[in-house]
Amino acid sequence: MTSLLTFCAAALMEITGCFAFWAWLRLDKSPLWLIPGMLALALFAYLLTLADSPLAGRAYAAYGGIYIASALLWGWAIEGNRPDQWDVIGAAICLVGMSVILFGPRALPA
């Protein structure tokens, strides 16, 4: 459960950081947006190191499902773009995959 909360916090930081660059380059916002954006991206990277996984690749793969669902929620909450049925179905598939990776039974290391 700790990893799930960590992944949610990491997703918020990654999306916030990336959106700062989007706002600067695509929405003509001030380059000052990059300061909190880069801080958010650094916090995102740190948060991923807190995942309850001995393997970085597995942690990143599991995180991907949370990221996808979070990005769609961001689009709805911040940009006003409500996810359609295909967005929801796609995110649900990703969350199932994330659950298999994160919660699937694992053999104990030898």
From Swiss-Prot:
Keywords: Cell inner membrane, Cell membrane, Membrane, Transmembrane, Transmembrane helix. It is found in: Cell inner membrane. It is a multi-pass membrane protein. Pfam families: UPF0060 (PF02694). GO terms for cellular component: plasma membrane. The chain crosses the membrane at residues 4-24, 31-51, 59-79, 88-108. InterPro entries: UPF0060 (IPR003844). This is UPF0060 membrane protein Rpal_4363. It comes from Rhodopseudomonas palustris (strain TIE-1).
